[in-house]
């Protein structure tokens, strides 16, 4: 079982003994327990285990008790804190001073004791000391004996906790570059300063010859390989598509069979490189058994590898999927072309939702007029104002087929613990594996092809690094859409019929970048996007503020934005205030 960070709950109290403190002990501790129960009951880690909370041993009224709480949290592996109170407390004495923890304060809205006054006072202290904290204050007054958590308070607590757990989970992990820069793509020029200072992560790197060495020297689990090949024969190879290569570039059946064996070994080895494998230690490969402690990775592929060896499409697709030959499991995060910037956006989406993430080229904007000209048909329904073609070189998660269903029977991408064996088979059945286009991939291989079901709410994200500014984040909430099959066929075949397609329509609003579908495409900051199931823009914005990454483009309603209270001091324009606050505070780990 993986070890995850915990969330610390800090019940603070008026320190005046002799009647005041004693009258508040039970109430304050009950609020702390209610917050812990809320989080544990609603939030899960990537493997499906509940997010754990640690409550201070007692209420915190004076600085010695703050220090004792801090020591306990360090021992217990806490990665973020929520301070809870129903009364006045001594602000600077009782506040959380750990500079690395995301922190929030819930001040109970009651009349008998001034929880709101403490909230305001301690948030002022956090702002003055440069330790931003999220303020949580219920809209409606509660009675003193009411220990329930109002819906608006619960929403903010869970939004904070979800993002804070993501921050703490990635801290101390690695991003593994398998290979180096792919085709001059800026996102694959990996910036170690960004990872270290903003995410608290380290960068690991291997030359792709390491994969060949492990194949040649048998540094992989042979039993697992046999199991993996049998599974691949049953579920993937049987869905091998037509070979569209010209005759002189078409591989023989024997060569294709060798490619299947090669890419299955490659998948096992890439996974072992990321997380290690205790089986390798049993086989005598102690160093290789360790792995690189990678929570995310990227595979360069093009051009040096793919010009000579089978491409990484199968390996990337399977690793990014919530299942493989070992059964249903948490999806990995692996960026095509080692685009680390997109890999980070995928990591954000995965940690916030516990779902597999789609990696795609943001390939083409199709206007209604262009579609009519090319196909003779009109886009209708949600696609009527134009569509964005999200497509990748056969390396997209199979969860993206939309063959999983939610409680309402609608297409979905689900956390691994909700996925059924029947849904696994549907995802596999909906995927065709085409021999790779050898104009692009001279070494061959196989590319996944599917068409995502329409009607899924999704959020497209992208992290960009800007010289002189630093990282910025883009967010576009929208939906996958289904279009007329004849329109899809014509548009798909003039793009690449061997690759997976997701037709995307963003939610439009009065912001310039979202005035129409074309503007979303025109304002996108790079060639790739990370697509997560669900409208999670609010959570992404909260996470970005914790990491001091400004959001330059989003279509989230302003009243849904939840950032640290200190952001209010940087002006009433939320976008400008975000930039000013992130610049002022700078990265957490610098």
From Swiss-Prot:
Gene Ontology terms, MF aspect: arabinose isomerase activity; L-fucose isomerase activity; manganese ion binding
Catalytic activity entry: L-fucose = L-fuculose
Localization: Cytoplasm
Main location: cytoplasm
The keyword Isomerase is assigned to this record: yes
Keywords: Carbohydrate metabolism, Cytoplasm, Fucose metabolism, Isomerase, Manganese, Metal-binding
Cofactor(s) essential for the protein: Mn(2+)
Pathway, per record: Carbohydrate degradation; L-fucose degradation; L-lactaldehyde and glycerone phosphate from L-fucose: step 1/3
EC number(s) stated in the UniProt entry for this protein: 5.3.1.25
Binding annotation for Mn(2+): 337, 361, 528
GO cellular component term of the entry, any: cytoplasm
Active site feature: 337 (proton acceptor), 361 (proton acceptor)
Top-tier EC class: isomerase
A GO biological-process term: L-fucose catabolic process
Pfam family of the protein (one): Fucose_iso_N2
Family that this chain belongs to: Belongs to the L-fucose isomerase family.
Matches recorded under PANTHER family: L-FUCOSE ISOMERASE (PTHR37840:SF1)
NCBIfam families tied to this protein: fucI, PRK10991.1
Function, in words: Converts the aldose L-fucose into the corresponding ketose L-fuculose.
Protein name: L-fucose isomerase
Species annotation: Bacteroides fragilis (strain YCH46)
